[in-house]
Amino acid sequence: MAGVPVFMRRILLTLTIASAFIGMNAPASAETITLVADEWCPYTCKPDSDKPGLFIEIAKKVFAREGIDVTYKTIPWARAIEETRAGKYTSIAGASIGDARDFIFPTEPQAQSVMTFYVKYGSRWTYQNLASLDKISLGTIVDYSYSNLIDSYIAKNKDNMRLVQQVGGNNALESNVLKVIKKRVGATIESAAVMEYYLATQGRTGQLIAAGAMPVNDDQNLYIAFSPKDPNAKRYARIVTDGTRALRQSGKIQEILNRYSLTEEKVSR
């Protein structure tokens, strides 16, 4: 600082010290994870809405305890799995183990799905066993897992449109409902909570009716599952496990369910 007046040296020194102090005390950028799913309300609903979905509200609560921010977007389910598997996103929300067996799962499920068959009102068909499916064409969604038994049936018959018809995209549920109504398929299979929520909110209550369900077992557990490419996946899975247990023990999870007119008995054993 040769040649700089003394008073200017003091100002520059003060500014340097102040800048260093501010830098030392500036908050670090918050850690952020990105969840993706298709629209599968009430589990995963529209982003940025007052009711983004059960899984999104659970995720935000459990990660907030760790100072981690959560962002959420909806894309078709097949893409959600593929791009999260590749490491583009952190996690898929509302997944069963059968959806993506290579992902990192919490040990505590966030909910459960009772996979139920639905037919057009007036239909006499009901699900009895796999043999009963031979009498209809079943509407399903690409890359969904419905239970080990039904997944195997779909894989075996996916190229036989008389038995299995698959749809994808953001409006897959609506597509299957319309196909049942128009008798393009004899039945569709869907989570009871999802189908009942859809029919009620779309003014279609009574147009489709339940016609049997799969036995409730661990095949139907649903999770927030993490990308196998993410180095923090195991840590995130532990956070979700511990956080979900804490929400259940405190009764906070029922407060979330109340917002979607659900009881824990309906989404959990």
For each feature predicted by the language model, list its residue ranges.
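A ligand-binding cleft/hinge motif common to bilobed small-molecule-binding domains
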Residues: E82-R85, A95-F103, S152, G186-D218
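A bilobed periplasmic-binding-protein/Venus flytrap-type ligand-binding module shared by bacterial periplasmic
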Residues: T116-T126, D219-K234
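Short loop->beta-strand "edge-of-pocket" segments that line small-molecule binding or catalytic clefts
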Residues: T32-C45, L130-N148
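Extended ligand-binding regions for polar small-molecule ligands
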Residues: I56-R65, A131-S137, Y144, I224-R259
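Ligand-binding cleft/hinge of the Venus flytrap
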Residues: A59-E66, E108-P109, S145-G169, V177-K179, ...
